[in-house]
Amino acid sequence: ENGERLMKMIECQTVSSREIYDDTEFAKLRAAVKELFPLLHERAEIKYFSEDCWVYKIPGRDESRNILLMSHHDVVAATGDWTHEKFGEISDGKIWGRGTVDTKTSLFAELSAVEELLAEDFEPACNLYIASGHNEEIFGDGIHEAVKYFEKQGIEFEFAIDEGGGVISAPIDGIDCKCAMIPVHEKCYHIKNVRAVQG
């Protein structure tokens, strides 16, 4: 059942591009998410930033505290040859398609968990925010606009959870076990000037 539900999000071809923003597929995704997660849309406060960055807020018992779940719903272009449908196919018990790994699956998991908790009348101990960007793949401004809003409102987070790396075997020499790769910041870059002095 969850596989079929996730497929409704994968089928939306939300490809981010620097050249043009086409809302058609992003609108399909918004409609699919609203259909898949009705309690979230009934109970959360929802704000949109830039063209299509979403922020949901589920109020908690202690409104002075906040946590943030992050993701993004844009994908890179599905170029090249694919053995399965580029935007969604279930085959041999596996879900195939652009966005299954990066990263509609994690967004689906976050939204599903919250939907299930809301169905049990769960009230979080603190405010729960879910933010999803629409142009992360091209270093776009979507989530930055949401951050500006948080700063202006004085909203600070006790922690934020974003997409992570995979669980991989032996990531470097000398480590012979499976390791979960945990990133410590959002996609960005750092410029460092290094000067070496002999002696």
Language model: regions and residue ranges:
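Short beta-strand segments
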Residues: 70-72, 132, 161-163, 194-196
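Short Gly/Pro-enriched turn/cap motifs at secondary-structure boundaries
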Residues: 45-47, 181-186
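Polar, glycine-rich mid-to-C-terminal structural blocks
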Residues: 179, 191-199
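Acidic/histidine-rich catalytic neighborhood of metal-dependent amide-processing enzymes
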Residues: 101-181
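Acidic/His- and Gly-rich active-site-bordering loop/insert found
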Residues: 1-100, 117-124
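Short coil/turn connectors at secondary-structure junctions
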Residues: 62-67, 91-92, 124-128, 153-158, ...
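Short strand-loop junctions, especially beta-strand C-caps/beta-turns
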Residues: 13-15, 133-135, 196-198
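Active-site-adjacent bridging/hinge elements
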Residues: 85-87, 190-193
